[in-house]
């Protein structure tokens, strides 16, 4: 049985409303079309405000990642985050000083750094500082300032002033969107300003973002995408966005 794209879109919206999420692989089988075609459907529906894409599928607006608590965020796309973390670890050397923000992907990165020595971590994330503190050879600096109680990160002028006293060999950021046109973006403006300063205080900037973030533009802009030295992501069908980022000088590595 064949479906018009309009009919398929209607049914996908109904499935999202019923189950809260859909998977690309399951929709591909259901409609007997390629996963590439399903991803294009999801892109259209996301642009219309019906859903948000995540790795391997999409979730309804009532289950947006931005609305999840910290525990839910940590579990979401766990396999993709672990793969990104293992890739990120290859970019880190003993004796590095690393600035990192509050993304849950970076908690996985810290776990992947368990074999490194004499690493200094500067972060505004309580969760990531706690992870880093598990390794005796790591030096951990948790930035002070105002505390976001839901997502456990610090922000504000006190955090920025403290950050500006430090210099890092590398900055690893988790972002909610990256595109050639809109740059690096996050859902919260108080996070974005601090992330911008982390880039300014570091020699090399590494962005770890799964493919659902490619081409995405959310509320708060950090900086131009060209400020990214390395983008670490999982394999994506969004070759158009990948090519645009490469033209800006971003070196892209896929898991």
Ranges and model annotations:
Residues 2-7, 14, 20-27, 32-34, ...:
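Conserved phosphate- and dinucleotide-binding cores of soluble alpha/beta proteins
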Residues 2-25, 30, 36-99, 110-116, ...:
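HTH-adjacent hinge/linker in prokaryotic transcriptional regulators
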Residues 101-103:
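Glycine-rich beta-strand-to-loop/alpha-helix junction loops that act as flexible
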Residues 116-117, 202:
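A structural signal for short coil/turn segments at secondary-structure junctions
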């Amino acid at each position: 049985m064949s479906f018009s794209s309009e009919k398929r879109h209607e049914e996908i919206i109904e499935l999202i409303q019923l189950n809260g999420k859909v998977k690309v692989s399951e929709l591909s089988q259901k409609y007997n079309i390629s996963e590439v075609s399903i991803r294009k459907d999801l892109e259209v529906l996301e642009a219309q405000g019906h859903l948000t894409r995540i790795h391997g599928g999409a979730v309804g607006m009532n289950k947006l990642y931005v609305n999840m608590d910290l525990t839910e965020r940590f579990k979401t796309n766990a396999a993709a985050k672990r793969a990104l973390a293992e890739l990120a670890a290859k970019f880190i050397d003993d004796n590095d000083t690393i600035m990192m923000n509050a993304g849950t992907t970076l908690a996985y990165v810290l776990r992947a750094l368990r074999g490194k020595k004499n690493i200094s971590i500067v972060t505004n994330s309580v969760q990531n500082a706690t992870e880093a503190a598990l390794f005796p050879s790591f030096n951990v600096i948790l930035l002070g300032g105002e505390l976001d109680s839901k997502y456990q990160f610090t922000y504000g002028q006190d955090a920025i002033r403290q950050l500006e006293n430090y210099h890092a060999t590398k900055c690893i950021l988790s972002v909610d969107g990256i595109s050639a046109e809109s740059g690096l973006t996050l859902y919260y403006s108080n996070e974005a300003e601090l992330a911008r300063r982390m880039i300014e205080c570091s020699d090399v900037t590494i962005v770890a973002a799964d493919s659902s973030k490619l081409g995405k533009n959310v509320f708060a802009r950090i900086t131009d995408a060209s400020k990214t030295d390395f983008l670490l992501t999982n394999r994506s069908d969004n070759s158009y966005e990948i090519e645009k980022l490469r033209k800006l000088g971003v070196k892209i590595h896929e898991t």
